[in-house]
Amino acid sequence: MRQKTATITRRDKSFTGHYVPVKPTPIKDPEYVAHSKNLFSELGFADSMAESADFVRMFSGDMSGVPVPMRQVGWASGYALSIYGTEYTQQCPFQTGNGYGDGRAISVLETLIKGQRWEMQLKGGGRTPYCRGADGRAVLRSSIREFLAQDHMHALGVPTSRSLSLYVSKTETVKRPWYSQGSRSENPDMLISEAVAISTRVAPSFIRVGQLELFARRSRSNEHPKAMEELEKIVLHLIDREYADVIDTQLATPEKIVLLAREFRGRLTSMVANWIRVGFCQGNFNSDNCAAGGFTLDYGPFGFCDVFNPYYQPWTGGGNHFSFMNQPNAAQRNFDMFCSALRPLLVSHQQDLLAFDEIQSEFLAVMDTKMKAMWATKLGLINLKTESDKALCNVLIKELQTLMMQAPVDYTIFFRELSSIPDDIGPLKKSFYSNLYNDAADDPDTLALEKYWIEWLEKWQMLLNSTCDAKGISSRASEDIAMQMKLVNPKYVLREWFVMPAYQQATAGDYSLIQELQAVMTQPYAEQSKELEDKYYRLKPLEFFEVGGLSHLSCSS
């Protein structure tokens, strides 16, 4: 929906409109790096298109030659910012919150392909009115991370924006703060020149919770006569783009909003449960990084767990509120801001407002149910028959989380090894970072911990038996459960220490490691070759712990 435009300058104090026309700034001398073969196939594109002159030109930011009826200009959108449920305006150049928005993301195309609507957005396409003094560029390093991550998350079965293509400039660079080799500094300790790149991401829309907040805030403060109308339009546009298949267009607007809240709650809770399932931490889950369509958006300082740690946080500025196991609570704060933004449209519809408030109040209960179901699925306990078995499953989950921290264990490797339903704890040792069973075999604490692991495994095996017939778990049943577990517990995840060599090689024009990672990470549940297993299914080397750019990241991109 682009019914309104807005022109923003440093002097403006109030604004209207849903978008701003922006012409991308092409990168100089673009070179092909990668494209998503899976998405190209879905769209009916030939792989050869990714390196064709017209395609490269457009998706490296040059829209001067686009065919009719396309326009030679894209658009950027404004949004508000809330961090963990608190509204912020401090970094806005106007101190009003009206200066936030797509600082380097420019949408260039909206199209209908095979019945599916897609919006295509350049990331790193140059300055927009929302860049707050920045250059509007993205560097190759961060572009590779996001490109690979979106492809990987889709293959993992996690709702996400999609990667389309990635191009790098052979001659244009910008300076960014980053870490020196082997640095253990919390924040970047040097300034480096990096090649600029443009990646294109694709989704049905890029409407964020923060975008709804922006129009709600304008309505709340009566910034202009059509503020409430613009809020309603952006909400109806969201429904049209993301929820048209589940919300009847003939319903009255208040009824649509109640259904929207219910549907978004379902998508948001499922998405976050999936994040935990695969070990993903978004790192910076502000409302402006929360897609109102209920999918993963904005791969900045994200990371995948190596060692299981509830407080794992890849971003040095993220704090515990965006840490791995607190993501359900962060999601609840974003849902609260979502509801707060929609509520003004219901103030004169009390029955709808009551239903709406009930949906909001039940968020954590729904989230808890999704989380328990997710853990049970990871443990292969999907057919529990009695309430006592379900209660025991919840106890096992809590005990396991404690044991995983005490060992400690590699999150991905542990659950993948457990998926083979081992008879004893031997195979699980592959996931242990502590050398418990060698150097300290006679240590009382080690022996006690080993005893707890054995007891836990026995209780888990007994509960698995209860999901089968009275004769216990058969060989065939065991194989079926193992197969099901291996479909939810990935063997391969995109660890930061896999990605760093890829973007380091890419700076020298060698993209082969990107292609290898793309091939492996788009088949995360497959066994793959012994060579790839030895390379990508292993514990994080000790020398990589606490290293900047490997264990922790800044927002530099």
Swiss-Prot record:
Mg(2+) binds at residues 289, 298. Keywords: ATP-binding, Magnesium, Manganese, Metal-binding, Nucleotide-binding, Nucleotidyltransferase, Transferase. It catalyses: L-seryl-[protein] + ATP = 3-O-(5'-adenylyl)-L-seryl-[protein] + diphosphate; L-threonyl-[protein] + ATP = 3-O-(5'-adenylyl)-L-threonyl-[protein] + diphosphate; L-tyrosyl-[protein] + ATP = O-(5'-adenylyl)-L-tyrosyl-[protein] + diphosphate; L-histidyl-[protein] + UTP = N(tele)-(5'-uridylyl)-L-histidyl-[protein] + diphosphate. Its cofactor is Mg(2+); Mn(2+). InterPro entries: SelO. The active site is at residue 288. Pfam families: SelO (PF02696). Coiled coil: none annotated. Its EC number is 2.7.7.-, 2.7.7.108. ATP binds at residues 101, 103-104, 123, 135-136, 201, 208, 298. One of its GO terms (molecular function) is magnesium ion binding. Nucleotidyltransferase involved in the post-translational modification of proteins. It can catalyze the addition of adenosine monophosphate (AMP) or uridine monophosphate (UMP) to a protein, resulting in modifications known as AMPylation and UMPylation. Belongs to the SELO family. This is Protein nucleotidyltransferase YdiU.
